Amino acid sequence: MLQIVIDNLEALKLDYSRFSVQKNYFNSEMISITLICSFPNKVGELTIWNDLSRVKEWIDYETEKINCLERKEFDTLENLINDLYLFIEECC
């Protein structure tokens, strides 16, 4: 399931000067991926888990405080990927 998300990200040809992707493993199994979006004053992170849930957070660089933290669960992979696209739009 996470490989489909990664394939979608690769198809977008993101600007990797602003975005980075981190794959997280447990016992050699990929359990989540994190899309990180960097701005001069804040960073956004969207972590997608293999159970069709995601956590989105925005962190202020100066204070290192989380400005927004949101967890959401999805019933389909398509809805999760649509939410991923919304996060990417927020970052542009």
Per-region residue spans from a language model:
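Negatively charged, low-complexity tracts enriched in Asp/Glu with abundant Ser/Thr
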Residues: M1-F39, E62-L77
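Divalent cation-coordinating acidic motifs and surrounding scaffolds
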Residues: I81-E90
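Charged interaction patches that mediate protein-protein contacts
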Residues: E29, E89-C92
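Amphipathic beta-strand/beta-sheet edge segments enriched in Tyr/Trp
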Residues: S53-T63
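Short beta-strand micro-motifs enriched in acidic
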Residues: T47-D51
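Short, charged/polar, Gly/Pro-enriched secondary-structure boundary elements
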Residues: N41-G44
